[in-house]
From Swiss-Prot:
The gene is pyrB. Pfam families: OTCace, OTCace_N. It comes from Methanococcus maripaludis (strain C5 / ATCC BAA-1333). L-aspartate binds at K82, R164, R223. The keyword NADP does not apply. GO terms for molecular function: amino acid binding; aspartate carbamoyltransferase activity. The lineage of its organism: Archaea, Methanobacteriati, Methanobacteriota, Methanomada group, Methanococci. This is Aspartate carbamoyltransferase catalytic subunit.
Length: 302
């Protein structure tokens, strides 16, 4: 694995290998809290968009592996403001670091970065396109909290048009047998046709606008992303259209996930229910990103 740009670039066996390595990393965290697999190595985090969990979990993961972190979160303090191209930025920074994690508002920016980098590049989110490390931690959460990925029944609710986490996860789930997916969204935020076409025939799909979470293993809530709307009035038409409450969940045997941040799509009263796993899901980002960093670096020096 040279880079991690899209879930389309890796297969089922590579996914399972990353999940197995993530278990080993979680065990190390629980036993010692750190290791020295990447001692003396440097991760560059290039965040052209705001981030809390992804950026901090990458930094935590690298430091837990014994490495160091450089990077930026405010492009106003970089040569981007002088007109430097992304390709040139990557060529320079790949000379300073052993690994790069990049978040960028433009679809395709991560792939362009990989094409211009001397070191492994990890896509930490490119526009509404892909977010593969979130997908891998989602799969790890499902494996740990549900117990299986094959024959999974999952409902995605909310912004399925701009939600890159949903696009990536659906593509990954299509590699596993017996998966059934419910796509629940307003008409304005339906899953892009190209994603549907990519997974159709590989898994059982159903699309609807009303919340229906009977007979599912996982409910995956998503935020309506105001920052993706060109017309803010269109955002306010769908804001708050879905809100998961204690009444929806009851005593259902279901795992509730959310990539976070949330706004108002999950009532805060749900947080204390045993079915709520979204904060644990966020924690899993550290061992999973530790595994990704370790495996990518090892492959780069073979």
């Amino acid at each position: 694995m040279r880079h991690l740009i899209s879930m389309r670039d890796i297969g089922r066996e590579e996914i399972l290998n990353i999940l197995d390595e993530s278990e080993r990393m979680e065990a190390i965290l629980n036993e010692k809290g750190h290791c020295d697999f990447l001692n003396g190595r440097i991760l560059a985090t290039l965040f052209y968009e705001p981030s809390t969990r992804t950026r901090l979990s990458f930094e935590t993961a690298m430091k837990r592996l014994g490495g160091n972190v450089i990077g930026f979160t405010d492009i106003s303090n970089t040569s981007v403001t002088k007109g430097e191209s992304l390709a040139d930025t990557i060529k320079v920074i790949s000379g300073y670091s052993d690994l790069i994690a990049i978040r960028h508002p433009s679809e395709g920016a991560a792939r362009l970065s990989g094409e211009n980098s001397k070191v492994p590049v990890i896509n930490a989110g490119d526009g509404s396109n892909q977010h593969p490390t979130q997908t891998l931690l989602d799969l790890y959460t499902i494996k740990r909290e549900v117990g299986h990925i094959e024959n999974l029944k999952i409902a995605f609710i909310g912004d399925l048009k701009y939600g890159r986490t949903v696009h990536s996860l659906c593509q990954a789930l299509s590699l596993f047998k017996g998966v059934e997916i419910k796509l629940i969204s307003p008409e304005e935020l339906k899953m892009p046709r190209e994603v549907i076409e990519d997974i159709d025939g590989k898994i059982k799909l159903s699309e609807m606008t009303d919340v229906e979470i009977e007979d599912v293993d996982v409910v995956y809530m998503t935020r309506i992303q105001k920052e993706r709307f060109v017309d803010v009035n269109e955002y306010y038409k769908v804001k708050g259209i879905y809100r998961l409450s204690k009444e929806h969940i009851g005593d259902k045997d279901v795992v509730i996930m959310h990539p976070l941040p949330r706004v108002d799509e999950i009532d805060s009263e749900v947080d204390n229910l045993p079915q709520a796993r979204y904060f644990k899901q966020s924690f899993y980002g550290v061992p999973v990103r530790m595994a990704i960093l370790k495996l990518l670096f090892e492959d780069s020096v073979k």
